[in-house]
Amino acid sequence: QSHVHVSFEMPEYTADTVWLWTLRLLEAMRVAGIEKTCKFYQASTSELFWWLEYNRPIAWYNEESPMHPRSPYWCAKLYAMWITRNYKESYDMFACNGILFNHESPTRWETFVTRKITMAVAKINLWLQEKLYLWNLDAKRDWGHAKDYVEAMWLMLQQDKAEDFCISTWVTNTVRNFVDWSFEEVWIEIAWKWKWEDEKWYDKKTWKCLVEVDSRYFRPAEVDFLLWDSSKARKELWWIPKYTVRDMCKEMVASDIEKFRKQEILKNHWYEILEQYEL
C-alpha cells in the first residue's frame, strides 16, 4: 500500500505492507545465510522530508538532510529506510536505499494524481466522463519517468559498495501544469475562474466546465513543495534522466486514450472490464 491518502484510512495495513515486509525480507536473507551474496534495494521516498524551519536546507535536500515524515505511509517508509541501513551496518549486507522523487508511467496506479489526470482527460476526450475533480492544484512535484528511475535503481546495484542515493530530475512542476499539458494532448485549451476551493476550469471553445476543486481529496498533512539534490547520483552513477515531464505526460495520455477505446469495444461485446486499483 503506497498511497498517502489511503494510509490515513488504513495506517496499520500500510505499516504491515511497507516497513514490516522490508524487515521480513532483510531478516529472511540473514537467516538463509545469503546476506553476503544477495543485494537488497529498498525504494524510499522523497516525502520523508517536510519544509520546516529546523530542517530547511540552505539550497536543496540531500541524502543526509533531517527527516520529518507527515503521513502514516511516510512514517512506514522512514522505518523501512533505517532498518535497511541498520542491516547493512550490522551484518555487512549490500543493502541500499533509493530516495526517489515521483516517477510515473502509463502503468501508474489509477489512484495517483498524474494517472488520475491522464485517465480523466482521455475519458473526457472520448465522451466517457464529464469532469475531473482535484484538490491542491498548486502543489509542486519533481515528476520523472519510471524508465529513468529504474535505470538509476539498477546502477545503484552495480556498485562495489552499497550507498543511498537521491534520485530526482531537478525540475519541479505544479499539478496545474500537468492538467494543462494533458488537455493540450487532446487539443483542448482550458481557462480557469476563481481561486482556491471555488476554482473551476473551462474549455475555452465551449465554456464547458471540465475541472473542479473537490475537498474530498484534501490531505490532513500535505507536502506542497520540495527541492532535491541528486548530484551524488549524477557524479557517482553517471545517471542523467532522458525523458522530460512533457514526454511522460504525452505518453500517458496517449496510452489511456488507447486503453479506453479498446475497453469500449470490449464493453460493446459484453466483456467485463476490471479496473486497476491499489489497496
Residue ranges and their predicted role:
Residues 30, 39, 70, 77, ...:
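Basic side chains
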